[in-house]
């Protein structure tokens, strides 16, 4: 029995984790490439934000976001929750990328690659991620969703506190690495709240696969 449960769990991770990564990466990079060829962009930041100093070592927290997502998919306790989490991340990605296409942003910071000790990380980041998929920040949205899914798995307060602290550090990192502005962070949290409330929690309460399917269809009607 335990072997069968483990087998189903690993199967859900492989199928839904792979589908989620493929969907989100392809959609984000495609949107990024399209928007990079636009002629006009929206500036949704305060001028005073441009005076915020860059803190190079915060890129370590910025990149740790990928680890948080990985852990959330691997550590949630049931195949059903893995499916709920993956679908929520994909819906969030679809909503965000639609906004990126309709309202492409312009970042107020000047990008610098020659940062001693972190050159390769910043160079790779700037090559892959063009400065227009800004709001909502998917770093914020995905981190919040992932942390929430993990928090729902346990009642350990210390674990909850560490996850919340991790999300806070990622939130600080997106602006201290000069990748996002305050508006991007705020809208990232808003998108996370919307998709957690109307997608993740709905899916978690619908245990039957047919109820899951009907719930997703209803979300888009």
Predicted segments with their positions:
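N-terminal transmembrane-helix/juxtamembrane module of multi-pass inner/ER membrane proteins
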Residues: 2-68, 105, 112-118, 122, ...
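Membrane-interface helix-boundary motifs at transmembrane edges
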Residues: 6-12, 74-86, 151-159, 201-210
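Residue-level signature of transmembrane alpha-helical entry/exit and packing/kink sites
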Residues: 9-17, 21, 84-85, 163, ...
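Interfacial segments of alpha-helical transmembrane regions
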Residues: 16-17, 69-100, 163
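Aromatic-anchored segments of alpha-helical transmembrane domains
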Residues: 25-26, 93-101, 165-175, 218-221
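Alpha-helical membrane-inserting segments
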Residues: 27, 31, 35, 95-99, ...
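Short helix-capping/hinge motifs at transmembrane helix termini and TM-loop junctions
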Residues: 77, 103-107, 177-178
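Membrane-embedded catalytic cores of phosphoryl/pyrophosphoryl-handling enzymes
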Residues: 122-212
């Amino acid at each position: 029995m335990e072997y069968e449960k483990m087998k189903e769990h690993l199967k859900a991770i492989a199928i839904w984790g792979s589908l989620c990564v493929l969907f989100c990466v392809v959609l984000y990079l495609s949107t990024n490439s399209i928007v990079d060829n636009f002629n006009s962009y929206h500036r949704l930041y305060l001028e005073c934000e441009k005076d915020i100093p860059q803190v190079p070592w915060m890129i370590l927290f910025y990149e740790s976001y990928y680890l948080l997502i990985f852990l959330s998919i691997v550590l949630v306790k049931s195949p059903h929750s893995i499916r709920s989490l993956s679908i929520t991340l994909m819906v969030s990605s679809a909503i965000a990328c639609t906004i990126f296409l309709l309202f492409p942003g312009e970042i107020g910071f000047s990008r610098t690659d020659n940062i001693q000790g972190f050159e390769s990380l910043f160079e790779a980041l700037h090559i892959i991620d063009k400065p227009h998929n800004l709001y909502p920040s998917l770093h914020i949205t995905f981190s919040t969703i992932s942390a929430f899914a993990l928090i729902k798995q346990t009642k350990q307060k210390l674990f909850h506190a560490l996850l919340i602290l991790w999300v806070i550090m990622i939130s600080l990192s997106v602006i201290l690495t000069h990748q996002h502005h305050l508006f991007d962070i705020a809208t990232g949290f808003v998108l996370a709240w919307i998709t957690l409330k109307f997608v993740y929690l709905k899916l978690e309460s619908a245990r039957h696969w047919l109820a899951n399917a009907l719930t997703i269809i209803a979300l888009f009607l």
